[in-house]
Amino acid sequence: MKQTTQLETGAEGTPDVRAGDKPAAGFARRSRPSRQAAYEPDEALSSYAAPPLQPWEEDAPRSAQPPAAPSSTLMPKAAKRMVILAIVWLVFLLFVSLKPAHAAPEAGATGETANGARASYQLHCAACHGTDRLGGIGPALLPENLSRLRKGEALKVVRDGRPATQMAGFGQALAADQLAALVDWIYTPVVPAPVWREADIRASRIQHTEPAKLPARPVFEADPLNLFLVVEAGDHHVSVLDGDRLEVIHRFPSRHALHGGPKFADGGRYVFFASRDGWVTKYDLWNLKVVAEVRAGINTRNLAASPDGRHIAIANYLPHTLVLLDGDLNLLKVLEVSDRDGKHSSRVSAVYDATPRHAFIAALKDVPEVWEISYDPAADEIPAGLIHDHAQREGAFIPGYLNPRRTQLNDPLDDFFFTQDYAELMGASREGKGQVVNLDARKKIADLPLAGMPHLGSGITWDWRGRRVMASTNLQAAEVTVIDLQSREVVRRIPTRGPGFFLRSHENSRYAFVDSMMSPEYKHVLQVIDKETLKVVHELTEQPGRTLAHVEFTRDGSYALASLWEDDGALLVFDAQTLTEVKRIPMRKPVGKYNVWNKIMREEGTSH
């Protein structure tokens, strides 16, 4: 199996822009100088085809004259019986050997199914996906890594392969029941659970390019701060889009199943990606080259980067670790994640950079704690255990640099949102419990009146009637919740078509765009909210059954780019004032797009 992918399909269709209320006059737009180059991929993936099945060899020609029968005087009756038995046995063995390799297993052979699937895997899949299923040139095939891929889609990929990839189909080599058994097997946990140690991380590092040998200036004419990186999950590529001309200037292959949140650093020159298989990639956006890669885990949630790009944090589900790297992707430290007493291990839900605090903030999935890991070498020491006197330093302390400060809570957090000063975070759990945590006092200070499953990590802020408000989608309820950040009261619940995932705006726009991608009936609809009236004023629609989601604005807020999340998808470019479509750029399932300026400046209308 070469490079199994998350396969999504959608029907073809044409856009249908449905008018709502008349759009209001827009805000003043910022102006900036506008500054494309053709590209060639750095390295094309070689095509792969499974070796053809070898026909059985025909029997060798036999002599026309049969051999003379042995003399009875030389062969006793017992010997004759043994010869006959031997001939019968040879005929049986010949029959078994000629039985097709894909024959269905005998009835009652269910106990051998796993062994058969394991044998099929080692024969057809291990060369690319690893003998231990941890991945190689193909992705890891573990339940954690396949959680976003339905078994039916996985079966289709294994049977038919994936066009334009190294993943060949095995429908001719394996029978239907063998294919089903193989897919079932890769969705079963590995026992004992796989590990990924410090030595594995160090050994996996690949240096592709020496940064010192590259020019310290962009090799293209576009504004480097108005570039978009577009993650195309359809064929595992990333496109670099000029935000002024709205044209692709470069496209390069990525690791399998990138997480949708690349992180920019060093003024936007470098960007760091994380794949679901744990691969971290450093990319030089000015020179359009991959610099280095390292595998930091087996199943990874996301990564965070300090603004100068000198420290990188990777949140893992498998193993239960938080991995810290330097800017060249060399290992600094692996933090084994567990509660304070070391009794309960935990996955890491997410990690984000808190720039004013010179620290990473991580939420734990299985333990009710939030960690703050300072990347300031001069950080204050952290008390360890009982401290009799802080002033006199009576007690045990550990270095504050790259060690966790723990905030213990009553409930774990799956998602969170920083206030503007990064002194507090607003978090939510899968059970719909919201809370406010003060990172300086390291304790919960308030509850949030949230229901359903709010997606606070996608929250945005703006000023409304003299108050600073935050708005968030909800993964279970058809609404956008608007909260006063001072009083922490809900000021409005805005009804939407269905549960949504992404909410986006820009400080130069009076509009916020929200999807309903969690709704099967309305995932093709984008709704536009007026940030002054807190009402839906417009709808943008695609053909039902397709998914329209994830908006990102250009640097000055002039245009809003939305993703048509299909393998034959596109970026839809809308005028941010008139809300009319001005351009459509074909893409292979563009799951996300990220503007350099908006990310490095922590623009209020986007997540960070």
Residue spans for each PLM region:
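Flexible coil segments in periplasmic/lumen-exposed cytochrome c-class electron-transfer proteins
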Residues: 107-115, 122, 168-234
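Repeated scaffold domains used in trafficking and secretory/extracellular systems
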Residues: 217, 258-263, 300-304, 344-352, ...
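Residue-level detector of Asp-centered blade-edge/turn motifs that repeat once per structural unit
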Residues: 223-224, 266-267, 307-308, 355-356, ...
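Short loop/turn segments that connect beta-strands within beta-propeller blades
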Residues: 243-245, 285-288, 326-330, 375-377, ...
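A short beta-strand motif characteristic of beta-propeller blades
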Residues: 247-252, 289-294, 331-341, 400-407, ...
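Surface-exposed loop and turn segments in beta-propeller and other repeat-based domains
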Residues: 335-343, 377-378, 382-409, 448-453, ...
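Loop/turn-rich, solvent-exposed surfaces of beta-rich toroidal or solenoidal domains
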Residues: 501-569
